Amino acid sequence: METATDPVCLEGVSVRFGSRKVLRDLTLTLQSRRVGIVGRNGSGKTTLARLIAGLIAPDAGRVTVAGVDVCTDRRAAIRTVGILFQNPDHQIIFPTVEEELAFGLRQLGRSKAEAREGARAMLARFGRDDWAERAVDGLSQGQRHLVCLMAVLAMEPRVIVLDEPFAGLDIPTIRALRRYLEALPVTLIQVSHDIAALREYDRVIWLEGGKVAADGPADETLARYLAAMEEVDDADADL
Amino acid sequence: MLTLTSEIRTPYHPIRAGAKLALLCAATVGLFMLGSLGAMVAANAAVAALYLVPGRPFARDGLRLLKPVWIFVALVLAWHVLTHDTRAGLVIALRLTAAVALANLVTMTTRFDDMVEVVLWLLSPLRRLGIRTAPIGFAIVLVVRFIPVLLAKARSLIEAWRARSPRRAGWQVALPIALVAIDDAEHVAEALRARGGFDTE
Amino acid sequence: MERQITLIALFAALIAVLGLVPQFTLASGVPITAQGMGIMLCGTVLGARRGALAVLLFLALVALGLPLLAGGRGGLGVFVGPTVGFLVGFPIAAFVAGWIVERMRNTPILTAAFIGAVIGGIPVMYVFGIIGMSVTLDKTFAESALLVTPFIPGDLIKAGLAAALTASLLKARPASVLSRG
């Protein structure tokens, strides 16, 4: 059931990398609780994900999440939107789990003690109390994904952007992580090649060449997207 | 791969790298042996002429490569003006610009691969001492491969920091960057070993 | 053998990447680049010989025309400019830093690496740097020394970071710390 949530608004957003136009004059308002973004490699989905998280500045237009200009007001942005990247090894900064979870809380302004408390509380929520002192190095791939998720959740954002969050994991692990995600009351915006993951979503947007090719209920957009992908022959593959 | 070699074709590009380097050495030694203001002015004029032969855009690129030297030129001139020894200051400054500009000219007109060949050739006498030079050429290739990969990983980690903090990335990102770098090196070493490695020569 | 060569190449690349990190500015208004820390790390992590080789490899690439020095500088020009002394000092600094870490085998790595990084990265490197400046700018040693003193506090910070990083690497990836191998 769709519920009105904190809107993610893109107004006339364009992004250029050098001479290449990655996103063209995009205007979107995302208010569904579960939004999926599909598209081919190079379509601009990853750039869109980073825009919503406030990590890239648009060359034109504005991006706001729940009224916060996520690019210019970083202080408020980190309270509002979080992002989960594809590879935990490119995300985890600190050597122990507790430090990694506490980092975001410190950046939100909590004291060292409060941050430690918050980290432990998050670990308890997931039944991983014993992970506090553990070295991230010693954890498995799936466990590292969970650490990244907990680190983002600890900051209690209203919107979480997921950029291909399950790449490289085995099926049971994906299932378990998905269960955690689906139970969350926050808005999820997931960029994915995994169609199955997005079937249950409220709204799916298909990005093609930096523009919106289709936008609507999940089953509609996904059907159109899959049909189009069937039409693409080998010559147009990303090789 | 981004090198400093100019994409603008010059008449100097086809000249053999070894020859250009030898000329450069001779010219640099000469510059440091001459002491007169007149000689320095002449030298700079000659260098400027060399740069203008391929055209103004090329000369402008050359000027840009000289930017780091300007601050030293300014320092030297200021110093010497204050100590009432302007003439000596001008000699030093002009010698500096001529020497650096000449060296840059060689860099701008010589391909990276040709330079590597010269280096390996210069190192070849080492083989008589039992030192193998093949790994050196290989090491060069490896560094060129590592730099963009390392950069990308560093950027990802810095981005991951910025996703959770309004502040610029701090010194703490140095460790995870070093770790992913070392792990990448392990994979490369493994791939090398799988393809025969160095010990099978 | 493969691991040693790849590590040497990796650290040479690391020096380059550290040169691309944006400069910090100290309270005194002096800009510091992270590249010097890379030099120290080559010594403290790889040891004297291999650390020096890594730095020489880096310098070779700069000479060959890659813009790897902080600020995107490179090419043969930098070897005739006023900073040439520092470039000569780089591999020697790494060697000394590594030699100290190797010699102080029984001292905890953090201390040994700090001492190595400070001695290699500051007095050794600066002596060569100052000589180079004196020759190219036609100044006395003392006069050139004056020009570089503001950069020393930044280098102390870099030495501390290099030492901490070396110690962490010894814990996390002991096989890569060739200075204590």
Predicted segment positions?
Chain A
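Conserved beta-strand-loop-alpha-helix hinge in the C-terminal portion
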Residues: K211-A235
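Conserved ABC transporter NBD signature motif
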Residues: G61-T72, A77
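Helix-to-loop junction immediately C-terminal to a conserved catalytic motif
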Residues: A53
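Conserved ABC ATPase "signature" region
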Residues: A113-W131
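Conserved ABC ATPase signature
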Residues: A135-L139
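Conserved structural motif at the start of ABC-family nucleotide-binding domains
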Residues: V8-L10, V22-L23
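Catalytic Walker B motif of ABC-type/P-loop ATPase nucleotide-binding domains
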Residues: I160-E164
